[in-house]
Amino acid sequence: QPREPFHPLFGGMPYTPLSLEFQITQENLGHAGHLVYLGTLFEEVLQSDTYENGKGSTVSKVLQNYQKTHGISAIAGVPNIGTDLNWTGHLFGQANWYAFGRLAWNPDTSSGKIAEDWARMTFSNDKSVLSLVLKIMMMSRETYVNYTMPLGLNHIMNYDTHNGPEPWHDDPVWTAFDYHKITKDSIGVNRTAKGTGATRQYHNPVGEMFDDIKQCPQEYLL
């Protein structure tokens, strides 16, 4: 999805080596037709606090928990290349491969720093060029989320391609109602302790935040 919270397995399995898989290909992010810099998405996940050992127990630190996991750690990526000479369909798609590599090497690197390094190597060191390119890159993912997945809604997309609208698709497990539970009285899936209980899988205060409609960030609300 354009945005999801981190999985509660990170922070819930302290003695088990875990690998984080990022999707580099833009399956749910506009394919090669939309400029979406994924470095900010990757950083958002890696810097999410699991509170496994109190404040500061980020997903990044969970992945680097070498003492408990016998020195084993990994980050995987799922890319997709086409027949274009630049592989990715548009030039900025290459920035996502670059961002993945940099963060796999050092998961605490700033996505802004990575974007700047890539822009300098790709375009120019000219300040006016960098300013414009970085502005576009750093806002691109959030912009895509806002025009395709408002309020945390998901799967508003074509069934086959995961790109573009298809409200006429008739499938009992791929409809707005199935995913959004829209009725005349409400919208959204109740994942709180009074619903599916999914929020209980997170350490507090993360679980408490997701469990409270007044505290839950709007981007995760539905």
Spell out what each predicted region is.
Residues 54-222:
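Catalytic domains of carbohydrate-active enzymes that cleave complex glycans
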